[in-house]
A protein has these predicted regions:
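Residue-level signal for mature regions of secreted extracellular proteins and peptides
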Residues: 9-10, 67
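Sec-dependent signal peptide recognition
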Residues: 2-7
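C-terminal motif of bacterial Sec signal peptides marking the signal peptidase cleavage site
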Residues: 13-15
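Function-determining sites in protein domains
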Residues: 17-135
Length: 135
C-alpha cells in the first residue's frame, strides 16, 4: 500500500513539472512580437516597435504570464501582438501608466484574462515607448 502511494505521489509531481499556465501555452514558441503604443487617452497608434529577439519576446511573455487580477477599466496604452511562424498567437492589451491600473489583458480559451503588471514590466514598456532598445 505504501509503495502504491509513493508511486502515485511521484506521478503527480512529475505531471506538475510539465504543465504551464494557459497563457504560457498559448504564447509558447512565439518568434516575433509587435508592440503598438497608443497616443494617450486614445486608441490611435502612435508608435510601433517590432522584434524577433528571443530574449525580448521571452521577457515580455513572462511579464504577461503574471498573477490573475481584476479587469480594470482604465483604458489601454497599447498592445502586444505575439506571432509564431506568421500566425497571431496572442493579442495582449496593456496599461503601463495608470496609477492602480497596471495590467495586461488577453483572451485565453475564449475568455478575457487580466493579469497583474509589475513595476519592472511597466518601466520596460515605457522605455521601449521612449525609443530605448535594451532587453
Amino acid at each position: 500500500m505504501m509503495r502504491l502511494i509513493s508511486i502515485a505521489f511521484v506521478v503527480v509531481l512529475a505531471s506538475c513539472g510539465r504543465s504551464g499556465s494557459a497563457i504560457s501555452k498559448q504564447l509558447a514558441g512565439s518568434d516575433s512580437l509587435v508592440i503598438n503604443f497608443n497616443t494617450p487617452q486614445t486608441n490611435t497608434i502612435d508608435k510601433i516597435v517590432t522584434t524577433t529577439d528571443d530574449k525580448a519576446i521571452k521577457k515580455l511573455r513572462n511579464y504577461v504570464d503574471g498573477k490573475t487580477t481584476e479587469a480594470y477599466k482604465c483604458g489601454y496604452d497599447g498592445n502586444l501582438l505575439f506571432y509564431k511562424n506568421g500566425t497571431l498567437t496572442g493579442d495582449v492589451s496593456f496599461n503601463c501608466s495608470g496609477d492602480g491600473c497596471l495590467h495586461f489583458i488577453m483572451t485565453v480559451d475564449g475568455k478575457l484574462t487580466p493579469t497583474s503588471m509589475s513595476n519592472e514590466a511597466a518601466d520596460f514598456l515605457k522605455s521601449l515607448a521612449e525609443g530605448k532598445g535594451w532587453y
